[in-house]
Amino acid sequence: MKKILLLTFLSFLLISCGSSKSSSSSKTTKVERTSKSNSYKKTESIISYAKTFKGTRYKFGGTTKKGMDCSGLVYTSFLKEKISLPRVSRDMAKKGKRLSKDKISKGDLVFFKTNKNKNVINHVGLVVESKRGNILFIHSSSSRGVIVSSLDEKYWRNAFVEGRRVL
């Protein structure tokens, strides 16, 4: 029995932050359309708030400074601007406008498939900078907590699925 529990626990750690607290199906998701100047202000505010979590340890299902998973970071950061997104990365990937890599800009979301055994989006990051094709995003890594990474890093380049614009 202990071996089964240990294997189950290790499995959860290995799948990064792909799933977490399920969002209620009775809740509606509100993605707000805004003017360009208002959108810019909201984008800056969301990114600024997300950066306050840098260094926060990874915690499956976490949404606070005590621990944060990838979708929790994005969910909490957007909620600061009263923008409600689904709580799970694979559901977030259904919102907004799909973007090719060359159209991704600051404030967009980037989605990944990091579990080689499952063909499902299980990781999300928030783009904090996009200059000359170099895309930097903040996310919560299961091994390093909340950090900023580059889409040019081999691991993330290979796991990348799509970008989405929700603002």
What are these regions (language model features)?
Residues G18-K27, R33-N38, V127-L167:
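Aromatic- and glycine-rich peptidoglycan recognition patches
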Residues T34-S37, R57-K106:
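Catalytic cysteine-centered active-site loop
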